[in-house]
Amino acid sequence: MEAKETARIAKVCEKNGADGILVGGSLMLKNNFEENLALIKQNVNIPVIIFPGIFNFVSPHADALLLLSVITSRNPQMLIGEHVRAAPLIKHYNLETIGTAYMVVESGNSTSVQFMSDSTPIPRKKYDIAVAHALAGQYLGMRILYMDA
């Protein structure tokens, strides 16, 4: 998406009561990431928070970064590997991190995050498995649980 369009949408979100703007995703391209963040930051008065797909989506233009651990993945890169790679940049920018347990739940369709993170979604009707994952995230000190279906 073009940076100006992104900034316009962020303004609309703020006007309609959003508490913050998440920027990122599983397949976001790096080529206009910094420009998008800077423009959004200039155009809204609510927190701009990075929702990183991989380690290099770290920027001083954001207010914070969701430090995502895909707790439904058994891929060590998604559990800790990307965090280790991002840590020096996070420290350099003195960026606030928000520990986030990312849980993929079965939706009936394969999703980008499921594919990119090598994650096995939690079956929709297996509440005990979802609760166990959520508790594990809590006990690991995660501040937020983000569920994606």
What are these regions (language model features)?
Residues 1-149:
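Alpha/beta enzyme core
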